[in-house]
Amino acid sequence: MSIRLFLVRHGLSTFNKQGLIQGRIDESYLTDEGYKQAKLTGNILNEIKFDKIYSSPLKRAAETAKEIEKSFEENFDIHYDKNLLEVDLYQWSGLTSEQIKSKYKDAYLIWKN
């Protein structure tokens, strides 16, 4: 028995649009464009037979999963799993790349390389 796994990134979020690093903070949510992206993704994926949908519990991921789920004829219970959380970027969360480069130059260079 083989398993097929599809990974989908969340749609455009408010932090993405503002150029802010998100990490695990849950202050960002989908923009109108992000909802459109999720709907389009669902329309593409709805011809594939899925057994389950898993999502990070973060708003931006959960909103994406819910929008994708609407595209299927079958109703799914979305399984929210903390193991799917974004990498925690601690003090970088909520900052722009430029702010990080300025404030945490050495750490940024290590992370980037």
Predicted regions and their residues:
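Short, basic/glycine-rich phosphate-binding loops at helix/coil junctions
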Residues: 18-21, 106-113
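An N-terminal RHG(E/S)-centered segment typical of histidine phosphatases
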Residues: 1-50, 66, 71-74
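Phosphate-coordination/substrate-recognition cap region in phosphate-metabolizing enzymes
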Residues: 40-109
